[in-house]
C-alpha cells in the first residue's frame, strides 16, 4: 500500500471512530435509551470502535511500501526507547506544571482542562475507560498527528531540516491542540505536540512519543481519580514558589 493511501485511511478511520457512535445511537435499539443509559451506550460503542480503529490503523501502516525519509533514517536502538520515553514524560510534566502556573496567574484559581474533567467523570462511571484514555487514545492520536500530519509535512518540505521541523511541528501541534477543543489550554496541548514531535524526530521511532503520551494521559487520569486534592495542593505550592521569584 502506498503511504498516501495509508495516511488518508488513517485520518478517515480516526475521524469515523470519533463521530460514528453519535450516529449509531440514533438507530434502533438505542432510541429507547435516555440519560445515563444513552451516555453509557455511546461510550461503550466508542470504546469498541477505538479498539477496531487502533488495530486497523496499525495494520494499514505496517503495509506501507514507500516510507518517509525520516522513517528510513537510522533509528535509536530499541533498548533506548524506554529511557527516551521517560525523559520525554518528565519534560511534558514539567512543561504542563509551568504552563498551569502561568494560566492560573492569567485566569485566576486552579485551572483544569474541561476535556480532562469530562474524561475523569466518564472514568469514574466506567473504569475500563481508563485503559482507552491511557493506551488506545494516545496510540490513535500519535499515528494521526505525528506520523501522518507531522511526518508528511516534514517529508514534503525540502531544504533545511530545522525549518522543515519548525513548520511541521507548528502545524501538527496547532491542529492537535485545536482538536482537544479547550481554548484556554491550547498552549498546554501545543507544547505537548512540540515535545512529541521532537521525540519522534530525535529517535526516528513513533513508539517513543506514543509511550510518552500514554504515560502522560495515564498519570493525569489515575492521579486525579485517586487523589484530586493532591493536585490542588501541588498547584498552590507551585504558585507560592512562583510568587517568591516573581512578586
From Swiss-Prot:
GO terms for molecular function: endopeptidase activity. The chain crosses the membrane at residues 42-62, 81-101, 119-139, 162-182, 183-203. Keywords: Hydrolase, Membrane, Protease, Signal, Transmembrane, Transmembrane helix, Virulence. GO terms for cellular component: membrane. It is an enzyme of class 3 (hydrolase). Residues 1-17 form the signal peptide. Disruption phenotype: Deletion results in decreased expression and abundance of secreted proteases, hemolysins and toxins, as well increased production of surface associated proteins. A subsequent drastic reduction in proteolysis, hemolysis and pigmentation is observed. In turn, virulence is attenuated. Its EC number is 3.4.-.-. The keyword Protease applies. It is a multi-pass membrane protein. The active site is at 141. It holds the Pfam family Rce1-like. It is found in: Membrane. GO terms for biological process: CAAX-box protein maturation; proteolysis. PANTHER family: ABORTIVE INFECTION PROTEIN, SLR1288 PROTEIN. Belongs to the peptidase U48 family. Participates in the regulation of the Agr quorum sensing activity and plays thereby an important role in virulence. Mechanistically, elicits a protease dependent control of Agr activity without playing a role in the processing of the pheromone-precursor AgrD. NCBIfam families: CPBP_fam_MroQ (NF046050). This is Membrane-embedded CAAX protease MroQ. It comes from Staphylococcus aureus (strain USA300). The lineage of its organism: Bacteria, Bacillati, Bacillota, Bacilli, Bacillales. The gene is mroQ.
Amino acid at each position: 500500500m502506498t503511504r498516501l493511501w495509508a495516511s488518508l485511511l488513517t485520518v478517515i478511520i480516526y475521524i469515523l471512530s470519533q463521530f460514528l457512535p453519535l450516529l449509531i445511537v440514533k438507530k434502533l435499539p438505542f432510541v429507547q435509551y435516555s440519560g445515563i443509559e444513552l451516555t453509557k451506550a455511546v461510550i461503550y460503542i466508542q470504546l469498541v470502535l477505538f479498539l477496531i480503529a487502533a488495530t486497523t490503523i496499525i495494520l494499514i501502516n505496517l503495509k506501507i511500501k514507500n516510507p518517509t525519509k525520516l522513517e528510513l533514517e537510522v533509528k535509536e536502538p530499541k533498548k533506548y526507547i524506554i529511557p527516551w520515553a521517560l525523559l520525554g514524560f518528565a519534560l511534558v510534566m514539567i512543561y504542563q506544571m509551568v504552563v498551569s502556573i502561568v494560566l492560573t496567574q492569567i485566569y485566576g484559581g486552579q485551572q483544569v482542562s474541561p476535556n480532562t474533567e469530562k474524561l475523569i467523570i466518564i472514568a469514574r462511571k466506567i473504569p475500563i475507560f481508563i485503559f482507552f484514555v491511557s493506551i488506545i487514545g494516545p496510540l490513535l492520536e500519535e499515528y494521526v498527528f505525528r506520523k501522518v500530519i507531522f511526518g508528511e509535512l516534514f517529508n514534503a518540505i525540502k531544504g533545511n531540516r530545522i525549518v522543515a521541523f519548525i513548520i511541521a511541528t507548528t502545524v501538527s501541534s496547532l491542529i492537535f491542540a485545536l482538536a482537544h477543543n479547550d481554548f484556554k489550554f491550547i498552549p498546554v496541548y501545543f507544547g505537548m505536540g512540540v515535545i512529541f514531535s521532537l521525540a519522534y524526530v530525535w529517535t526516528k521511532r513513533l513508539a517513543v512519543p506514543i509511550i510518552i503520551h500514554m504515560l502522560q494521559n495515564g498519570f493525569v487520569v489515575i492521579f486525579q481519580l485517586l487523589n484530586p486534592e493532591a493536585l490542588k495542593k501541588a498547584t498552590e505550592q507551585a504558585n507560592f514558589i512562583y510568587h517568591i521569584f516573581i512578586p
